[in-house]
């Protein structure tokens, strides 16, 4: 089992990670990863700067969700080669809780229900756990409620959400909005959204997109993993990358997403067959 903070003394102070911001927030080089013995990521490279929004698109099975799980440190996803540097720190040496405390947030494609645990308790526990790891004073009930009410106002969300069990009985749109609200409270530096638009009708999609746009800032970067370009109509990315067979094979601006919508992934895959060199992977 990994230590939460292995390595040199700097790595034992997560607050240093959050303060030591460099222009390139996330740098992935030649990343290989496998799941249950099967290689999924096959030499992926990518650079993300603070303030940028990057969309990761690709067909089913290309490795999009695997990338998100590898970055967040989920068990069962084995990195076999390559490096991931986050704010100058080797991200792969950190346990999942240390990555979260350092500002890495993953919004799941299928948010889980936690019956009997209301959102207020869950969010306060999560926030204070991160503050404790960073050596910061935990928030008491009054301080936390003040913070949460401020976030509810900014995000234009009803306070009814606070009294409901986490995702229990929520619609698909409510679950996704709840994750965006969690992100607003936890204030990550790197937010990874794994198919946040999956299963949403147009009204729910617009609400989720509004939340994401509200949280865009020069200090925060987004990786938006998506299969379709419709989310990008409402959250306009700085860069779009096409992931195929475990590699980024093409990069561009939003016009690349429109090209994919018109011609599909087949043309991209045909021009970059498996085993060929990666093209345009680093933005």
What is the role of each PLM region?
Residues 26-28, 41:
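Conserved structural motif at the start of ABC-family nucleotide-binding domains
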Residues 57-59:
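The feature captures the beta-strand-to-loop junction immediately N-terminal to the Walker
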Residues 112-189:
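ABC-family P-loop ATPase nucleotide-binding domains
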Residues 192-196, 203:
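Walker B catalytic motif
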Residues 205-218:
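Helical segment within the ABC ATPase nucleotide-binding domain
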Residues 239, 243, 247-270:
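Conserved beta-strand-loop-alpha-helix hinge in the C-terminal portion
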């Amino acid at each position: 089992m990994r230590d939460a903070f292995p390595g040199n003394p700097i790595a034992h102070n997560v607050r240093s990670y959050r303060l030591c911001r460099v222009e390139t927030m996330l740098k992935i080089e030649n990343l290989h990863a496998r799941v249950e013995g099967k290689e999924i990521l096959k030499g992926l490279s990518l650079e993300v700067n603070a303030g940028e929004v990057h969309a990761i698109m690709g067909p089913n099975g290309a490795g999009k969700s695997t990338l998100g799980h590898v970055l967040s440190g989920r068990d069962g996803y084995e990195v076999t080669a390559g490096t991931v540097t986050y704010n100058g720190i080797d991200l792969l040496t950190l346990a999942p809780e240390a990555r979260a405390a350092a500002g890495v947030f993953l919004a799941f494609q299928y948010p889980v229900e936690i019956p009997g645990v209301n959102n207020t308790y869950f969010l306060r526990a999560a926030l204070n756990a991160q503050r404790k790891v960073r050596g910061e004073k935990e928030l008491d009930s009054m301080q936390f409620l003040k913070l949460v009410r401020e976030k509810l106002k900014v995000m234009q969300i009803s306070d009814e959400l606070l009294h409901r069990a986490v995702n229990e009985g929520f619609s698909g749109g409510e679950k996704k909005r709840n994750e965006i609200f969690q992100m607003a409270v936890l204030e990550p530096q790197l937010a990874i959204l794994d198919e946040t638009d999956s299963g949403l009708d147009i009204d729910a999609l617009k609400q989720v997109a509004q939340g994401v746009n509200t949280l865009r800032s020069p200090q925060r970067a987004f990786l938006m993993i998506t299969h379709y370009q419709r989310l990008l109509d409402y959250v306009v990315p700085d860069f779009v990358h096409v992931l195929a067979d475990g590699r980024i094979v093409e990069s561009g601006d939003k016009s690349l997403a429109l090209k994919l919508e018109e011609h599909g992934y087949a043309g991209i895959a045909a021009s970059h067959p498996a085993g060929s060199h990666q093209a345009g992977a680093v933005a």
